């Protein structure tokens, strides 16, 4: 029996875990390590930012969802990976040994690389569920005093689709 650890509980990590379970059956152990207890369906973030969906309607309890498929879950994040020992150390102190490691951590938002960019600067983001919720709040304030809007993505952005979708529905 192989032990597989999937690091990341977003679209990539959850999809990888489900595909592994379907392909390998239940003879192998699969554990997903994510950051937090909820799986957020990121493609719905533009809808949250415009008020078409509530954040609660676009996320699931990750442990519950994975358990139905016989997949273990730990939501305390990864502190470090010891490749020599084949171990994943979580932020909560749990150590998972593995035969195979799948890394699906997704993007790291780098708002600090451009002065003034990001939710704490002069722009809004829909990259995460909390960002989309904040964008909705800022959109409501904008409606009270409307003016020009610029929607786009900065250099190096890995995905322009959400910005285009948000522009089309706005």
Regions found by a protein language model. Name each.
Residues 1-3, 146-147:
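Intrinsically disordered, low-complexity proline-rich regions
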Residues 70-167:
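FAD-binding core/adjacent interface of flavoenzyme oxidoreductases
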Residues 2-72, 156-169:
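Beta1-alpha1 glycine-rich phosphate/pyrophosphate-binding loop at the start
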């Amino acid at each position: 029996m192989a032990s597989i650890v999937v690091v990341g509980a977003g679209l990539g990590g959850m999809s990888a875990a489900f595909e592994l379970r379907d392909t390998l059956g239940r003879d192998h152990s699969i554990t997903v390590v994510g950051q937090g207890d909820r799986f957020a369906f990121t493609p719905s973030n533009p809808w949250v930012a415009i008020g078409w969906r509530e954040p609660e309607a676009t996320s699931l309890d990750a442990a519950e969802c994975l358990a139905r498929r016989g997949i273990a879950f730990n939501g305390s994040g990864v502190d470090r990976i010891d490749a020599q020992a084949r171990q994943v150390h979580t932020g909560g102190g749990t150590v998972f040994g593995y035969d195979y490691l799948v890394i699906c951590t997704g993007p790291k938002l780098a708002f600090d690389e451009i002065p003034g960019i990001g939710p704490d600067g002069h722009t809004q983001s829909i990259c995460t569920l909390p960002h989309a919720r904040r964008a909705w709040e800022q959109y409501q304030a904008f409606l009270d005093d409307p003016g020009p809007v610029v929607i786009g993505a900065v250099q190096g952005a890995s995905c322009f689709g959400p910005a285009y979708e948000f522009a089309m529905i706005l």
